[in-house]
Amino acid sequence: MKVRPSVKPMCEHCKVIRRKGRVMVICPANPKHKQRQG
């Protein structure tokens, strides 16, 4: 899980979602692409 000031999809499988007011990226294809804003 990377924590970044700005999160962007890194591949076509990445999905941008909101959980508990936080913007996150989840990726089923490549778990290294998981990110969270903050």
Curated annotation (Swiss-Prot):
Keywords: Ribonucleoprotein, Ribosomal protein
Annotated protein name in UniProt: Large ribosomal subunit protein bL36
Keyword Metal-binding: no
GO biological process: translation
GO cellular component terms listed in the entry, alphabetical order: cytoplasm; ribonucleoprotein complex; ribosome
InterPro entries reported for this sequence: Ribosomal_bL36, Ribosomal_bL36_sp
SUPFAM superfamilies, per database record: Ribosomal protein L36
Family the entry assigns: Belongs to the bacterial ribosomal protein bL36 family.
Domain of life where this protein originates: Bacteria
Gene source species: Enterococcus faecalis (strain ATCC 700802 / V583)
